[in-house]
Amino acid sequence: MATQIIDDTPKTKGKRSGLGDILKPLNSEYGKVAPGWGTTPLMGVAMGLFAVFLVIILELYNSSVLLDGVPVSW
């Protein structure tokens, strides 16, 4: 029994589209990690602002039955 070698390269090329040409550079960066902190400080600021938003919502609804008895000492 002979061993058959199969070529894995595709015989046909895919159809090109304008959207594919635009998105191609984004896909070429797949798997690469930028050195350093990157956007970590920006994410920290976003998390801080979200925490402030949640505290404001809690203050607005503090008189509700669900949160009755939650002490506010500000």
Curated annotation (Swiss-Prot):
Predominant place of localization: plastid
One Pfam family here: PsbH
One GO-annotated biological process of the protein: photosynthesis
Membrane-traversing stretches: 41-61
One GO cellular component term: photosystem II
Subcellular localization, as worded in the UniProt entry: Plastid, Chloroplast thylakoid membrane
Gene Ontology terms, MF aspect: phosphate ion binding
Entry annotated with the keyword Transmembrane helix: yes
Modification note: Phosphorylation is a light-dependent reaction catalyzed by a membrane-bound kinase; phosphorylation occurs on Thr residue(s) in the N-terminus of the protein.
Residue numbers bearing the Phosphothreonine modification: T3
Membrane topology category: Single-pass membrane protein
Matching InterPro entries: PSII_PsbH, PSII_PsbH_sf
Keywords on record: Chloroplast, Membrane, Phosphoprotein, Photosynthesis, Photosystem II, Plastid, Thylakoid, Transmembrane, Transmembrane helix
Role summary: One of the components of the core complex of photosystem II (PSII), required for its stability and/or assembly. PSII is a light-driven water:plastoquinone oxidoreductase that uses light energy to abstract electrons from H(2)O, generating O(2) and a proton gradient subsequently used for ATP formation. It consists of a core antenna complex that captures photons, and an electron transfer chain that converts photonic excitation into a charge separation.
PANTHER family noted in UniProt: PHOTOSYSTEM II REACTION CENTER PROTEIN H (PTHR34469:SF4)
Family of this protein: Belongs to the PsbH family.
HAMAP family reported for this sequence: PSII_PsbH
Quaternary data: PSII is composed of 1 copy each of membrane proteins PsbA, PsbB, PsbC, PsbD, PsbE, PsbF, PsbH, PsbI, PsbJ, PsbK, PsbL, PsbM, PsbT, PsbX, PsbY, PsbZ, Psb30/Ycf12, at least 3 peripheral proteins of the oxygen-evolving complex and a large number of cofactors. It forms dimeric complexes.
This protein's name: Photosystem II reaction center protein H
UniProt organism field: Physcomitrium patens
Gene: psbH
